[in-house]
């Protein structure tokens, strides 16, 4: 199970990173939206493995982070599906998002609160890794930097920023996945590879 979770730490971000290649005039589009939504399944599976490791050192903080992460993944799926439906129904010029203004309390719960929770969860994850010394400082720095820059790439749709953020995430998560994979081969009693 731990090896599958380690692999998922790479697969999720790579699928997510493919989405900007399919954006259509600054919109997620059908394919980009599906890639965003689908990426959350392996990514959250891998991050649950990280939660298990973090809760040994900081149970309350790890639990709160997991809650924030799940809310963020809800927002990620919602925005991915919004892009899918916007593309499928031919809605352009942000008309699809503008229609959510007609449903303020519901769109707040589905999009506007959970959406920012994803980069916030990534920042908290990086901070937790640093605090618990569960990863090298450069991994945590890449994750935190990507979390801060994420809104520029995804909300403002600055494609070059989205690509840079995705590369930062893939590099950091690939290293974390490699370390998680190696921990599955360690003899019992050895520290968790930090």
Can you annotate each of these PLM segments?
Residues 1-194:
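Hydrophobic, aromatic-enriched alpha-helical segments typical of multi-pass transmembrane helices
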């Amino acid at each position: 199970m731990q090896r599958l979770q380690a692999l998922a730490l790479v697969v999720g971000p790579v699928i997510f990173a493919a989405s900007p290649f399919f954006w259509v005039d600054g919109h997620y589009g059908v394919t980009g939206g599906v890639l965003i939504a689908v990426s959350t399944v392996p990514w959250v599976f891998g991050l649950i493995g990280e939660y298990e490791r973090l809760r040994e050192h900081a149970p309350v903080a790890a639990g709160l982070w997991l809650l924030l992460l799940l809310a963020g993944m809800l927002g990620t799926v919602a925005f991915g599906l919004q892009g899918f439906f916007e593309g499928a129904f031919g809605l352009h010029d942000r008309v699809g998002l503008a229609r959510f203004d007609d449903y303020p309390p519901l769109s707040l719960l589905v999009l506007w609160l959970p959406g920012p929770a994803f980069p916030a969860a990534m920042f908290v994850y990086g901070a937790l890794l640093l605090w618990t010394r569960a990863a090298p400082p450069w991994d945590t720095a890449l994750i935190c930097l990507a979390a801060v820059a994420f809104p520029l790439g995804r909300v403002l749709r600055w494609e070059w920023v989205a690509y840079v953020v995705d590369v930062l995430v893939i590099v950091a998560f690939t290293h974390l996945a490699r370390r998680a994979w190696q921990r599955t081969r360690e003899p019992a009693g050895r520290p968790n590879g930090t």
